[in-house]
Amino acid sequence: MLLTTTPVIEGKRITHYYGIVAGEAVLGANVLKDLFAGIRDFVGGRSGTYEKELQHAREIALEELQENAHRLGANAVIGIDIDYEVLGKENGMLMVSVSGTAVFVE
């Protein structure tokens, strides 16, 4: 399945719009505590552990988006937006959400 942040796919013609599709993934409080506890793996101001967890959450959200688009009969998702949001100041959960428009292209 083609995934893109752009509103069109160059060289392809959109023949059907299925509508908005989304996917979400939430990192729980324990994961974030573990990540922040592992801050000592900082290299050049970046935490490899934290980045890996964020990447994994983004991959889960994108897989869910693809599954939802596939169920509709789409073969591409255009205009994808990826957002990161902290849920609750006390429990520190992090949500990765992705959304886009499911389409069929030829």
From Swiss-Prot:
SUPFAM superfamilies: YbjQ-like (SSF117782). Transmembrane segments: none annotated. It comes from the Bacteria. InterPro entries: UPF0145_dom_sf, UPF0145_YbjQ-like. PANTHER family: UPF0145 PROTEIN YBJQ. Belongs to the UPF0145 family. This is UPF0145 protein NE1032. It comes from Nitrosomonas europaea (strain ATCC 19718 / CIP 103999 / KCTC 2705 / NBRC 14298).
